[in-house]
């Protein structure tokens, strides 16, 4: 006979098992830093070997088409499988704000240029940020992350 306690335990297992396996994607590698003062180890993220090319999500080079949605789709797809590399290929890419998520390595290939739009409304809705040390809602920064971990911006 199944008790309510057994049913609840099974339900928790079903809910939390995918979350635990999702978090396994990124590993941390400690790096010792020589400093003239006591300092804890720095940890580098070792991201899974998965690439998400923004062109597969509709991005077009040339600096004329706004690629904000395509880049966001690539970031979301990468995040949903536990992380990896979102690749910005060689070329000029017009975009609005880029909102990173956990376990994302935003990778710029050699010759890749991000051109951020100069249209203020592209940086809305407002996000929590800081201005002169005060937390406030404001236009989104060019590259933004909030409540994230294991993120990097790398490239050649």
Segments predicted by a language model, with ranges:
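Hydrophobic h-region of N-terminal signal peptides that target proteins for export
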Residues: 13-21
């Amino acid at each position: 006979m199944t008790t309510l306690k057994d049913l609840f335990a099974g339900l928790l297992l079903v809910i939390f098992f995918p979350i635990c396996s999702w978090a396994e994607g990124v590993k941390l590698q400690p790096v010792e830093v020589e400093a003239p003062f006591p300092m804890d180890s720095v940890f580098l993220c070792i991201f899974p070997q998965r690439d998400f090319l923004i062109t597969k999500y509709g991005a077009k080079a040339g600096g004329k088409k706004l690629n904000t949605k395509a880049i966001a789709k690539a970031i979301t797809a990468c995040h949903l499988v536990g992380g990896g590399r979102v690749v910005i290929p060689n070329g000029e890419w017009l975009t609005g704000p880029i909102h990173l998520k956990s376990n994302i390595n935003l990778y710029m290939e050699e010759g890749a240029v991000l051109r951020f739009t100069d249209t203020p409304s592209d940086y809305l809705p407002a996000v929590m940020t800081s201005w002169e040390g005060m937390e406030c809602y404001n236009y989104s920064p060019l590259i933004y992350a909030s409540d994230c971990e294991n993120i990097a911006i790398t490239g050649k």
